[in-house]
């Protein structure tokens, strides 16, 4: 979630923002049902593109996951190279204001590593702080299913003034559109929709804007982890979590 940014002096790093988020939610699927998560996020813009990184530390409230134990971690690193910046020309047409080479590295415990690459676009949509649309071809580490499938990932931010403060609606969606089958098993198309609705409490209390947020995160995941939902094993997830987020 790219909320706010701090302008930086110098030619290489143009802006950056860092944050810590605490989330508490119930009714997760596949993993233990109650989860507390601490997330570190970093985003920046630099001379030739932008970067986004996050890592989750997930606690299962004393329960044990079959593979990860009482806690686990998961993260993603997503650099993008901007054609506008690299070629010093405007690659703009219609709503598209920049064309990028988008990449993502997914990592965590167990067999989770994947490498994603494809075209990305920054869109100018009225009212939005930003709107990104990335198309990835996924490549898994090892021989597990889910290799060479396509994923569509929009990410967005929208600010609504409310009284003396703001409500920020931001988030992403990962939509893997293909199925894959190999000797190790099956991987099903899945959709992960993850918006946050946050109130700028810091601005309301005159601590400074875009520094302290409270709100909720909604996590919908159809066929979580690419596992097909069934009567015997539910993998369709719908969870609302409470959150507190601090930018620094």
Region locations from a protein language model:
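Surface-exposed loop and membrane-interface regions of Gram-negative outer-membrane beta-barrel proteins
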Residues: 54-105, 190, 224
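Outer-membrane beta-barrel transmembrane domain signature
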Residues: 140-211, 220-223, 246-248
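Outer-membrane beta-barrel "beta-signal"
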Residues: 236-248
């Amino acid at each position: 979630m790219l909320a706010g940014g701090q302008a930086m002096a110098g030619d290489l790093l143009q802006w950056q923002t860092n944050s810590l988020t605490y989330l508490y939610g119930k009714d997760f699927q596949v993993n233990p049902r109650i989860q507390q998560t601490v997330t570190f996020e970093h985003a920046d813009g630099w001379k030739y593109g932008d970067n986004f990184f996050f890592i989750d530390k997930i606690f299962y409230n004393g329960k044990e996951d079959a593979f990860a134990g009482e806690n686990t971690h998961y993260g993603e690193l997503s650099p993008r190279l901007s054609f506008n910046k690299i070629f010093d020309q405007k690659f703009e047409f219609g709503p598209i204001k920049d064309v990028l080479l988008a990449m993502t590295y997914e990592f965590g415990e167990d067999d989770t590593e994947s490498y994603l690459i494809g075209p990305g676009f920054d869109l100018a949509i009225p009212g939005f702080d930003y709107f990104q649309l990335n198309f990835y071809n996924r490549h898994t580490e090892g021989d597990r299913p889910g290799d060479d499938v396509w994923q569509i990932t929009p990410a967005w931010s929208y600010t609504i003034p409310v009284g003396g403060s703001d409500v920020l609606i931001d988030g992403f969606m990962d939509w893997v559109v293909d199925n894959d089958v190999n000797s190790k098993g099956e991987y099903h198309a899945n959709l992960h929709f993850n918006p946050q609705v946050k109130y700028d409490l810091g601005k309301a209390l005159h601590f400074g804007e875009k520094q302290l947020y409270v709100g909720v995160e909604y996590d919908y995941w159809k066929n979580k982890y690419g596992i097909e939902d069934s009567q015997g094993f539910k993998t369709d997830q719908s969870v609302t979590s409470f959150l507190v987020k601090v930018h620094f």
